[in-house]
Amino acid sequence: MRLDTNSNVDFKAFESSSSSSSCLVKLDNLATWGGSQKTDTRLPITDYSTLGGPRHNRSPFPLSKDVNNRLVIWDGDMTTLDVDAITNTSDETLTESNIISERILAVAGNQLREELSTNVKECRTGDVRITRGYNLPAKYVLHTVAPTYREKFKTAAENTLHCCYRNVLCKAKELNLHTIALCNISVHQKSFPADVAAHIALRTIRRYLDKCTLQVVILCVNSNERGTYEVLAPLYFPRDQLEERSALWQLPKDIGGEFGEPQHPDPDRQIRIIRNPQHSVHMRHGHTDDDSDVSPHDMEGNSSDLEYGAKDMNGLSPNSYSSGLQTQLQRDLDRQHLLSDRPRAGVYENVISEGVEGIEHQERYERLLRRAQVEDLTEVSGIGCLYQSGVDRLGRPVIVFCGKWFPAQNIDLEKALLYLIKLLDPIVKGDYVISYFHTLTSTNNYPSLHWLREVYSVLPYKYKKNLKAFYIVHPTFWTKMMTWWFTTFMAPAIKAKVHSLPGVEHLYSAITKDQLEIPAYITEYDMATNGLHYFNPVPTAS
């Protein structure tokens, strides 16, 4: 089945390159899933109706010839397809080299590379960015970033992969595109289970085609993946009554929501072990085990901290966040309620309550500490982005982090973590403060939220407890938004300790000028932006 395209954009370069292409693949030459049954050489499907009861009482994905005729599963080179758009999977900087992205960039030419580096620059995990196709037969390329899969965070990874597929398909609909070629978005994430990824892809595509009746989706797979998709496709796209009936036994219990999003109905997957239960209890009552500093800005009555965010970075309302975040909040409330009446215990009782996971967590940190003490970390320490700079007015060590000097995309992040542990381990035994300078940073300086979450989870409780203040100097709106999101959903234990300051002089309320050693570019930027003597510091009395 072939639908006529209707694009309002005329790319002369595209027309000339595609007309001269000798290997252009038209949609008319591809067999749809509905027509593939005639040439299917596999053994007849097993009739499960003679076995025990099915998992589902009625078909969640009923037989639809119309839907089947708008799906193509194809083993071939996506860059040769004469379609409205193809997809590219990469990392957040869109510079990752994998078999799909390399092929797309090679055929599209340097113009696509230039657009990615100058205009697009980045794409966050689960989001989608659009560029022209240039020398490709396709008019557009839709770029997305697949999540990294870890068993501990599999729910988040599965939700995010669904978002990748759904956002790409919704963008195609928004642009009035009729034919779109999807790659296996998680193909370069070797840790992502192939069968789980296939279920998510097929389920999301099926829900999309049910709702959007004018689109044709070509799922491009390689020879190794094709077998998996051809085995699972009949569960979501049955071609006859026998396949539809057999799917009642073979489909997983989680058949997704309205749009195919994972729902994980198994309550066992919603239970997490609490590393610091007493700390969670204290957070529930509105205070921590220690008093956090008051922001100098708060003393002025003009706090620059971001308290609320009505929308996320894509302009979506909070209700449109993935269900995983809402579930996470409910879990935290439930577990805090269960622990609210638990009395304080001694050291040994705490070890027991934290369980095996807490012990393993401590052992992991100790292994990293031993590595940090023996490995050569000069490539990180030589950068000069993280160091101790004197003490604050209360005699507490001040840790300075210069964001501009942190090459997040060109550094071994594991060694960066080791250096962080080596520097801070002897300091965090007592109270300390951190001053982060966001001055003149760019996307190349931003580590992923996933890595930040990993670092936060690795560091023991003493890091959070003894941190008295975390100052962010020269924040941007994006910094404030992400800080609010991170401290709300990932690190609530330190939320009250984070203070955003518009200028260096605001720090002088907590840290005297002679104790603050910072690079010249920070002070020069501060003077150019705020002028001189714009704030009269009042020492904090605490």
Swiss-Prot record:
Top-level lineage group: Eukaryota
Signal peptide: none
Region of interest called Disordered, as start-end residue ranges on this chain: 277-304
Domain CRAL-TRIO: 373-530
Domain Macro: 58-237
Start-end of Basic and acidic residues biased regions: 286-300
Pfam family, one: Macro
Matches recorded under SUPFAM superfamilies: CRAL/TRIO domain (SSF52087), Macro domain-like (SSF52949)
Family statement: Belongs to the GDAP2 family.
Name of the protein described by the UniProt record: Protein GDAP2 homolog
Organism: Drosophila pseudoobscura pseudoobscura
